């Protein structure tokens, strides 16, 4: 179809992974499995500066998880979540601008928020149990 992007990409951060993933058959066939921002060389026409931002954001995202026991609350307070969410939105605008019309980048990133049980967890990490 005229005007339709050839490649569809899904944008979201995955623990220990990147943020740009295939979203259609053309992307899988021509670009591989992804995450594209971690492949060397990256198959996408993104600047080195943008790729470095992707890497830094992925590392930052990984700090939101409680790596000792992932189902328990992560360490981020709401201000950190808000900063991350804003940075994600800015990065997505940059990526879309650099990739142009051959790519459709679908935002699949869920906003992060402070875990409502964080205070209870921090008060007694060893004895913590979720109520839900």
Tell where the protein language model's regions lie, with residue ranges.
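Intrinsic low-complexity, intrinsically disordered or marginally ordered coil/linker segments
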Residues: 1-132
């Amino acid at each position: 179809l005229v005007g339709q992007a050839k490649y569809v990409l899904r944008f979201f951060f995955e623990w220990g992974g990147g943020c740009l993933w295939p979203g259609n058959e053309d992307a899988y066939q021509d670009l591989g499995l992804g995450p594209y921002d971690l492949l060397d060389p990256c198959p996408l026409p993104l600047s080195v500066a943008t790729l470095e931002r992707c890497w830094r954001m992925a590392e930052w995202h990984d700090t939101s998880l409680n790596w000792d026991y992932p189902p328990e609350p992560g360490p981020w307070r709401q201000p950190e979540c808000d900063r991350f969410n804003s940075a994600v939105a800015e990065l997505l605008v940059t990526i879309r601008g650099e990739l142009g019309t051959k790519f459709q980048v679908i935002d699949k990133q869920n906003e992060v928020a402070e875990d409502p049980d964080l205070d209870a967890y921090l008060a007694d990490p060893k004895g913590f149990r979720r109520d839900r």
